[in-house]
Swiss-Prot record:
Species: Conus amadis (Amadis cone)
UniProt note on tissues of expression: Expressed by the venom duct.
GO cellular component, one term: extracellular region
Keyword terms: Amidation, Disulfide bond, Ion channel impairing toxin, Neurotoxin, Secreted, Toxin
Any one GO molecular-function label of the UniProt entry: toxin activity
Annotated function: Probable neurotoxin that inhibits ion channels.
Name of the protein described by the UniProt record: Conotoxin
Location within or outside the cell: Secreted
Length: 27
């Protein structure tokens, strides 16, 4: 799943987005 913290999208997996400093699942 995508809920690690982030400052930018590159810190998240490719199927996630960085929003409000957390990685979130996106389709």
């Amino acid at each position: 799943s995508c809920n690690n913290s982030c400052q930018q999208h590159s810190q998240c997996a490719s199927h996630c987005v960085c929003l409000l400093n957390k990685c979130r699942t996106v389709n």
